[in-house]
Amino acid sequence: MTDISRRGFLAAGTAMLAAQALPRIAMARPVPIPLIAGSRVLDIDGRAATVWGLTGPLGQGLSFDPGQRFEVNLRNDLPEPTIIHWHGQIPPNRQDGVPDMPMPPLNTGETRSYDYELMPGTYWMHAHIPMHEMRLLAAPLIVRSADDIAADRQEAVMFLHDFSFKPPQEVMEEIAGGHGETAAPQSGTTPQSGMNHAMTGGMKMDPGMMGQAGMPGMDGMPDMSKMAAMAMDLNDYDWDAYLANDRTLNDPDVIAVDPGGRVRLRIVNAAAATVFWIDTGALQARLVAVDGHAVQPLSGNRFGLSMAQRMDLEIDLPAGGGSWPVLALREGGRERTGIVLATAGAQVARLAPLADEAAPAFDTDLAQEGRLIAAAPLVARATQRQHMVMLGGSMTPYLWTINGRSW
């Protein structure tokens, strides 16, 4: 029998208790956090789908606490080279994750180390190589602030994707050939070929349409011929499924909540080519942050979210028990996905993946975006430098550029 001292026994016991009490990866640790770009299998409406993902110690994505640095070892277990962009964060340029600017993609089996100071907020990470993000190579990147830690509220994440069982190259060929809209021809936005996020949407509007085509409940009667043209250009592709936390509404992610509690819902639109309306239904919500930064709260129960955008909604739940869906409605279509907030023992009603009516176009008159005010605005000062940025693109070839270059 091996002898053990009292001090050794206490030290071992303390270590075991600490390991059980601190399961979060956001605790300080002497070694970098492992993050693996690899394949995984999802059950999408009863059909197995092999997709890609970014897996940390606790599953898809990473979460950090105040003061923690982004000390991560990224390993590529995929069958081809890839590279990951830390969307919204500002790392040193060598760690930013755009291919060959200046670092090349990681080869299969290669590991690369990252270390930079994090900004708090709701962010995400994704491949910066065409076709890879369409394979769902993306995940949440959540950085909590000191206020988040102190707040008396629960946090939850809603991560949105559009998905096709077809290979991404085949999807792109169909879009480029004008055959991407097979079921709902009122389809606008463009797939993120090279992840060009500078354009908020792919809608083609002439100046006369601005201010005419409003959101639901807005005054003004637009020219119907222009409305018809706009409606035909809302979506470039009809996907096989729309996912929230890797699930459809046939088997939604049900998140346990407390009666009368407050929830901060961090929502990421990681879709390749879909704008969503976030609909909280019977629950009134407050939009408190956009793209990782706090804004003066906006109240409502429907908010638009374009590709690559993030928003944080704060929701106060009723004192009684119940279940409340939070839906993501496809712009210009009937398709929808979402999650369910539910108290213990509450009945969760089945939700149809198709709504009764198509959702409208998002924010053509900037009714939402024009009301956003930063909670901590920049200090007013005179302009010191100006840069001209030219946005370009076309359907044939299917290419979107900034200053003549794709990204």
Short names for language-model regions:
Residues 95-96, 104-106, 222-366, 375-380:
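Histidine- and aromatic-rich segments of cupredoxin/plastocyanin-like copper-binding domains
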Residues 77-79, 134-136, 151, 271-273, ...:
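A cross-taxa feature marking solvent-exposed loop/turn segments within ectodomains of secreted
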Residues 114-150:
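Hydrophobic or amphipathic alpha-helical targeting/insertion segments
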Residues 159-261, 268:
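Acidic-aromatic/histidine active-site loop/patch
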Residues 74-76, 118, 131, 268-271, ...:
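Non-cytosolic beta-sheet module surface loops
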Residues 79-85, 122-124, 275, 321-324:
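Short, Lys/Arg- and Gly-enriched loop/turn segments at beta-strand edges
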Residues 30, 134-138, 151-155, 282, ...:
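Short edge beta-strand segments in beta-sheet-rich domains
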Residues 2-113, 143-145, 149-156, 169, ...:
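N-terminal, post-signal-peptide metal-ligating segments of extracellular/periplasmic oxidoreductases
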